[in-house]
C-alpha cells in the first residue's frame, strides 16, 4: 500500500496543482470535496491533509469548512489561502476583510525557523530577513492567531501570511505554493509531504499505468470502445493506454472537421494505423461541421456546436460496432477545471471544453476518460512510459475544436485555409531555429537550453486568425487584408503560463514569410499575455 495524502478541495481553480506537486514528490494523493464525511477521512487514513484555496469568503459561506475529523485524526495539516483561513476560524482564530487585497506577485518575510520554511528563501534583506517570492490571491486575511499557533510569515499588507502549530503539525500559508509563480513552492510542499508527514516516496508512472489498465479493464469488460483521435498528445496517449488495456476492443475514429492543421489527416493515419497498429476509421465531416458553424460568432456556442457534432459522428460510427458501449476521450485536468467540472463541482467556469462541455445527457455511450486527473506533463510522462515515439509525445497540444477556436468570430473555410498555412510557417520556423549562446546571454533561454529548437523550448505555439483588416503596402500597391496573431507560451502544467520570449529575428522571419507566402494576410502581431490573466487559447 502507498502512503496517501488527502487534498480537500474548497473550489480553487488550481487545486489540482497541489496534487501535481505532491505527485512530483512521488507520493500518492487524491482530491476530494471539503464536505466529505468524518468517516471518509478516517477510513482514507492519510499521512497528511492539505486544505486548498477557494474563490469563496469565510464570511459568505459558513458551511465551507473542513470536517472535524481533520483536526481529530492527529496527522499534519497544511492550509493554503482559504485553507489557512478556515483553519484559523475552526481552531479559534479570527478572519476579517482586508482593506488591501493581494492578487499577484508578492514578497513574504519568513519568521520563526519553522520546519516548513526553515532555510528556504529567495533572497535576504539588508537586515538579514529571509524573503520569499510568492503568488497571492486573497481578499480576506487572518487577523488573530488561533491558540497554540505562532507567526510563520508576513507581508506589510498581510501581517499574518503564514502560521504554525508545530506541536500538532498544523501549518498554513496565505500564498499559493502550488503555482509556479511561487519559486520555492515545490520545495515547501515536498518538505511538508516528505519531511513533516513522513510519507514514502514510492508512487511512479509505472504504478499509474498498472492501476489505469486494471481500471479500464474492470470498467469496460468485454464491451467495445470508440475514441476520438485528433493527432494531439492527449488523444494519442489515451489511445495507447486503452489499447494496452483492451486491444482490438478499441476503435479509433479520426474526424476531419475541416479545422485541422496542414496535412494533419495524412500524418494521423500514418502514425496511428502504422505505429500503434490500432483500428482507425477516417471520416471526412468538414461540410457537416462548417455548415453548422456558419454565422456563429460566440465562442461558447462554437465549442458547444463542435462538441455536439463530434457526438453525432461518434454515435453514427458506434452503430456500426455491435458491442460499442463506451466513448473514450483524451480529456485532461486543465480541460476539466476550466469547465468547472472538477470532482467537487465547486470551481467557477472559465470556458467550456468540447470534451467536457459538449456532451448531451442523451448520449447513448458511457464516457471513458483515463487521463482526466492528469496534467499535460504527466500525460507526456505516461506516453513515454507506454513506449510512444517522441515526435508523438512531445508534439504541441492541439484543441479538440481545432482551428474553430483559433478563428475569432465566424468560422469560414477561407479563414481556416489562411490560418493553417500561417500556422504551418510559424511551426516550421520554430522547429528549424536553434537557441544560441546569444539568446542565452540576452536572457531568452537558459544556458543549458542552447542547441535546442525553439519548438522544443515552447510548450504550445500557434497562429490565431483575427477577422479584422488593416491597410498595408505591397510593391507599389495598397492592400487591405487580414491579420494573424502568433502565440507561444512556456509552462509545465498549462494551468499557468508565461508568454515565450522568442528572438526578434525568429519573429521577423515568421512575419516576412507569412505576409509574402499567404495571400490575404498583410499584418502579423505577437501575443505577450500570460495565463492568468489571459487563457492560452484566444477562445
Curated annotation (Swiss-Prot):
Gene3D superfamilies: 3.30.300.10, 3.40.50.880, HUPs. Its EC number is 6.3.5.2. Keywords: ATP-binding, Glutamine amidotransferase, GMP biosynthesis, Ligase, Nucleotide-binding, Purine biosynthesis. Residues 203-395 form the GMPS ATP-PPase domain. GO terms for cellular component: cytosol. It catalyses: XMP + L-glutamine + ATP + H2O = GMP + L-glutamate + AMP + diphosphate + 2 H(+). Residues 4-202 form the Glutamine amidotransferase type-1 domain. Pfam families: GATase (PF00117), GMP_synt_C (PF00958), NAD_synthase (PF02540). The active site is at residues 81, 176, 178. The keyword Repressor does not apply. Pathway: Purine metabolism; GMP biosynthesis; GMP from XMP (L-Gln route): step 1/1. ATP binds at residues 230-236. InterPro entries: Class_I_gatase-like, GATASE, GMP_synth_C, GMP_synth_GATase, GMP_synthase, GMPS_ATP_PPase_dom, NAD/GMP_synthase, Rossmann-like_a/b/a_fold. GO terms for molecular function: ATP binding; GMP synthase activity. Homodimer. Catalyzes the synthesis of GMP from XMP. This is GMP synthase [glutamine-hydrolyzing]. The gene is guaA.
